[in-house]
Amino acid sequence: MTTQSQPMSQKTMVKKRLHTQEVLRLTSSQGKQLEVAKGVLWVTQEGDPQDYLLHAGERLIFERRGLALVQALTEAAYCLSQN
């Protein structure tokens, strides 16, 4: 996975929300971008030994196949798009 702090393009962004401790399950995450608009998200992905903490303004590009879990550590808003 690659983390970046630059905003992604507006092409296919849809802002969604997660409540504190709520979990988003992504079964086909490869090629997707996750950008945090508000709050803090914890991200882990099958086959990746590293976990990620993303804060508002940061984004992550999923480079592996497999299940990814995204958990809100605070009230959060995010955008998920295809890379």
Where are these regions (language model features)?
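Conserved short histidine dyad/triad with adjacent acidic residue
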Residues: 10-28, 54, 61
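Short, surface-exposed secondary-structure edge patches
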Residues: 15, 33, 50-51
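Ligand-binding loop in jelly-roll beta-barrel domains
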Residues: 64-83
